[in-house]
From Swiss-Prot:
Residues 447-454, 496-504, 561-588, 642-681 are extracellular. The modification N-acetylmethionine is found at M1. Keywords: Acetylation, Anion exchange, Cell membrane, Glycoprotein, Ion transport, Lipoprotein, Membrane, Palmitate, Phosphoprotein, Transmembrane, Transmembrane helix, Transport. One of its GO terms (cellular component) is ankyrin-1 complex. A lipid is attached at C861 (S-palmitoyl cysteine). Residues 190-199 are annotated as: Interaction with ANK1. Its main location: membrane. The lineage of its organism: Eukaryota, Metazoa, Chordata, Craniata, Vertebrata. InterPro entries: Anion_exchange, Anion_exchange_1, Anion_exchange_CS, Band3_cytoplasmic_dom, HCO3_transpt-like_TM_dom, HCO3_transpt_euk, PTrfase/Anion_transptr. This is Band 3 anion transport protein. It catalyses: hydrogencarbonate(in) + chloride(out) = hydrogencarbonate(out) + chloride(in). The chain crosses the membrane at residues 423-446, 455-475, 479-495, 505-525, 538-560, 589-609, 621-641, 682-702, 719-737, 738-755, 779-799, 800-818. The modification Phosphothreonine is found at T374. It comes from Mus musculus (Mouse). Detected in erythrocytes (at protein level).
Length: 929
């Protein structure tokens, strides 16, 4: 046994203060909770560097720099295998962020947050204060570590010299894992006892402890940790081994804390990653001591980031004790009352976040906190004011457009090569159906609104041509262009205006297209895209709620019209079926109701099915993502099987023909088709052009903002000015050919981005997967547009779709658009007592009556918009909508405090990659479908 006085002679106090090192590390490593700003993080308190003779710190080594990576902690407990009558160390639990415990049947339980008893924390603090610490031990084998540790135990009077041999043999016993045991029915916690006195060895004599180490391990089955731990341990992790055992010949519990000089694979140990720390907890059996819980507390302590960093840099016992006290200060204790509900436990989350926030607040002695402002938790190049901000104005004519081109086009070659991935092909198939379903639905409804002057044929061709050009030239090719609800509302309003003023609707659209091109050139020239920053959630939610109401209203309006055209009668005269009946037809109204309701309910069910527990996750997601086309297909089959009842079908021309060839052709003469277009209207068309531009600007720019969120970790950037020029410019040219203008559709674009996001493996059991990369390329959008264009050849199939089925999809889009709209949630709260209100910021931080006042103002704005939409002045709807922006910016700050507006109007939508808790893309975007 080495003389511990030799260790005492080499002790010296390091020149560098560990407090400074620890502060630097804490400041540089981003805290996992992204809701806590970097500038609000606090370092631990100043740590003393006084040495004690019981701390072993070799002077020849510098304090190792802590790793910011993951840590794997394994708890092994001394057990007796009653079947083989042998003692062995059994892996009882492990931690990779979350805790996994080994059940009695030998199967690993689900990952969960560690919950500790209050006693175990107090007892841990007690044994830590009297423990033995070896910091910076240069050993590469378990036998060497055990010898050093036992020598220190004897030197500090933790154990008697005659106990050394017994404990050494115990520490070097065979290790077993879950797959070695099958189940734990015959494995029980063991207690080391002396059967024949203090001098009689507990274990049989072995010729050499080092050479006979783990002599029976090869017979115990496969080596290594449990399969669960191995598969999910992040690379470059560091292992902490915690050993817990009971020994009745010991007089008191003893703790040994060992930090190796370098994390290395210990000889004689089969662990997945190099070992950096080793904790040994041994003691006599006592009624008030549960060594399993004590080991769990120690293992949980080693998984905590700040304590682990402190342990990596500590020079003495006091530094570790200070860090342990800080750990206890941030631990919550539940009193022994009745078990609270899950909802009540949710209130602990903000309390814990506040404790962590205070723990990481910068100390007064630290440098200016603004030094941390440039840190970007998402791996970007800086904050919103950085030079690469696409919305930053240059002050030059077309400066933003030129900067977009210079930023994005150098990646053009990689936009092609990055598409060489099976995930891109899968995304093409998925997005094709996601784009085709609304194109057919809106095309059919557009034909209804415009007497087939524009319909399915024009919309499919417009979507294909504009989509191909945008995929080739756009700055953000992940945007999906398409027709949307707001544009449908405008088309209906403009068609009614032209009808009432005896104007040719399709010619008026051509002049609107001409003015659209001029308007977008002016806006892009003066970098007007920066205005999107002033459009808050307040305006977005009013806009989305209005469109949802219009969708729902139009669905039932169309259904009522069917009941009026084909009323229910008590008796029917015999009828002969014709292609289009002239009078009432049996069951047409009821069957249309069944088709509409069936399509809606089926689509809603399949959407929720994605988050159910049936079938494997991938199959559920496929069924949920293709819910709309599956619903349409099923209801079309139902309609086909019931041949005796007439239903109105979708009107689709054969081939590349316009929907109404008797009224128009493919090229629109700007002076008029059948009569001269008024000169005054040629110039007055600038007003409706401005309104269309507002709609396209709102949808496209907000969609680009959502898709380009830093959380998505896209590296090639976006181009607000270039994309706006392309979308509006192509829409203006399309009007000359009698085709609809399009915008970037929010839900479809977010779905496209999610489909191309490659998620890495989870950092640990139960942890969320992190983004590995996003396939930012042009080929998927290009192929989707080509397939949509080829769908015009599916006329025999499309013409079999009943309009009632499209009404069901229309209703589905209206209802799903309400998801994620805070305004809708607050309207529901008007009818709930305050005690049933959810625990969310806009409820907790804002008084109830003031929250209802804010909701009431939004409802008034919504009512004004609905009145405008229902009058002949409906064409001015976008202009009235844009007035809500100055209302929010200028008037509401006079009524509400800044904190209240942040809670009620803040952008708290989270990026959704894996659908959990019933959330999907609709919950992420407060924009209409």
């Amino acid at each position: 046994m080495g003389d511990m006085r030799d260790h005492e002679e080499v002790l010296e106090i390091p020149d560098r203060d560990s407090e400074e090192e620890l502060e630097n590390i804490i400041g540089q490593i981003a805290y996992r909770d992204l809701t806590i700003p970097v500038t609000e993080m606090q370092d631990p308190e100043a740590l003393p560097t006084e040495q004690t003779a019981t701390d072993y710190v070799p002077s020849s080594t510098s304090t190792p720099h802590p790793s910011s990576g993951q840590v794997y902690v394994e708890l092994q407990e001394l057990m007796m295998d009653q079947r083989n009558q042998e003692l062995q160390w059994v892996e009882a639990a492990h931690w990779i962020g979350l805790e996994e415990n080994l059940r009695e049947d030998g199967v690993w339980g689900r990952p969960h947050l560690s919950y500790l008893t209050f006693w175990s924390l107090l007892e841990l603090q007690k044994v830590f204060s009297k423990g033995t610490f070896l910091l910076g031990l240069a050993e590469t084998s378990l036998a060497g570590v055990a010898n050093h540790l036992l020598d220190c135990f004897i030197y500090e009077d933790q154990i008697r010299p005659q106990d050394r041999e017994e404990l050494l043999r115990a520490l070097l016993l065979k290790r077993s894992h879950a797959e070695d045991l099958g189940n734990l029915e015959g494995v029980k916690p063991a207690v080391l006892t002396r059967s024949g006195g203090a001098s009689e060895p507990l274990l049989p004599h072995q010729p050499s402890l080092e050479t006979q180490l783990y002599c029976g391990q090869a017979e115990g089955g496969s080596e290594g940790p449990s399969t669960s731990g191995t598969l999910k341990i992040p690379p470059d992790s560091e292992t902490t081994l915690v050993l817990v055992g009971r020994a009745n010949f010991l007089e008191k519990p003893v703790l040994g804390f060992v930090r190796l000089k370098e994390a290395v694979p210990l000889e004689d140990l089969v662990l997945p990653e190099p070992v950096g720390f080793l904790l040994v907890l041994l003691g006599p059996e006592a009624p008030h001591v549960d060594y399993t819980q004590l080991g769990r507390a120690a293992a949980t302590l080693m998984t905590e980031r700040v304590f682990r960093i402190t342990a990596s840099m500590a020079h003495n016992r006091e530094e570790l004790l200070r860090s342990l006290e800080s750990f206890l200060d941030c631990s919550l204790v539940l009193p022994p009352t009745d078990a609270p509900s899950e909802k009540a436990l949710l209130n602990l989350v903000p309390v814990q976040k506040e404790l962590l926030r205070r723990r990481y607040l910068p100390s007064p002695a630290k440098p200016d906190p603004n030094l941390y402002n440039t840190l970007d938790l998402n791996g970007g190049k800086g904050g919103p004011g950085d030079e690469d901000d696409p919305l930053r104005r240059t002050g030059r004519i077309f400066g933003g457009l030129i900067r977009d081109i210079r930023r994005r086009y150098p990646y053009y070659l990689s936009d092609i090569t990055d598409a060489l991935s099976p995930q891109v092909l899968a995304a093409v198939i998925f997005i094709y159906f996601a784009a085709l379903s609304p194109a057919v639905t809106f095309g059919g409804l557009l034909g209804e609104k415009t007497r087939n002057l524009m319909g399915v044929s024009e919309l499919l061709i417009s979507t294909a041509v504009q989509g191909i050009l945008f995929a080739l030239l756009g700055a953000q090719p992940l945007l999906v262009l398409g027709f949307s609800g707001p544009l449908l509302v405008f088309e209906e309003a403009f068609f009614s205006f032209c009808e009432s003023n005896n104007l040719e609707y399709i010619v008026g659209r051509a002049w609107i297209g001409f003015w659209l091109i001029l308007l977008v050139m002016l806006v892009v020239a003066f970098e007007g895209s920066f205005l999107v920053q002033y459009i808050s959630r307040y305006t977005q939610e009013i806009f989305s709620f209005l469109i949802s109401l219009i969708f729902i209203y139009e669905t039932f309006s169309k259904l009522i019209k069917i009941f009026q055209d084909y009323p229910l009668q008590q008796t029917y005269a015999p009828v002969v079926m014709k292609p289009k009946p002239q009078g009432p037809v049996p069951n047409t109204a009821l069957f249309s109701l069944v088709l509409m309701a069936g399509t809606f309910l089926l689509a809603m069910t399949l959407r929720k099915f994605k988050n159910s527990t049936y079938f494997p996750g991938k199959l559920r997601r496929v069924i949920g993502d293709f819910g709309v086309p599956i619903s349409i297909l099923i209801m079309v089959l139902v309609d086909s099987f019931i041949k005796g009842t007439y239903t109105q079908k979708l009107s689709v021309p054969d081939g590349l023909k316009v929907s109404n060839s008797s009224a128009r052709g493919w090229v629109i003469h700007p002076l008029g088709l059948y009569r001269l277009f008024p000169t005054w209207m040629m110039f007055a068309s600038v007003l409706p052009a401005l309104l269309v531009f507002i709609l396209i600007f709102l949808e496209s720019q907000i969609t680009t903002l959502i898709v380009s969120k830093p959380e998505r970790k896209m590296i090639k950037g976006s181009g607000f000015h270039l994309d706006l020029l392309l979308v509006v410019g192509m829409g203006g040219v399309a009007a000359l050919f009698g085709m609809p203008w399009l915008s970037a559709t929010t839900v479809r674009s977010v779905t496209h981005a999610n489909a191309l996001t490659v998620m890495g493996k989870a950092s640990g059991p139960g942890a969320a997967a992190q983004i590995q990369e996003v396939k930012e390329q042009r080929i998927s959008g290009l192929l989707v547009s080509v397939l949509v264009g080829l769908s015009i050849l599916m006329e025999p199939i499309l013409s079999r779709i009943p309009l009632a089925v499209l009404f069901g999809i229309f209703l589905y889009m209206g209802v799903t658009s309400l998801s994620g709209i805070q305004l809708f949630d607050r309207i529901l709260l008007l009818f709930k007592p305050p005690k049933y209100h959810p625990d969310v910021p806009f409820v907790k931080r804002v008084k109830t009556w003031r929250m209802h006042l804010f909701t009431g103002i939004q409802i008034i704005c919504l009512a004004v918009l609905w009145v405008v939409k229902s009058t002949p002045a409906s064409l001015a709807l976008p202009f009235v909508l844009i007035l809500t922006v100055p209302l929010r910016r200028l008037i509401l700050p006079l009524i509400f405090r800044e904190l209240e507006l942040q809670c009620l109007d803040g952008d708290d939508a989270k990026v959704t990659f894996d659908e959990e808790n019933g959330l999907d893309e609709y919950d992420e975007v407060p924009m209409p479908v």
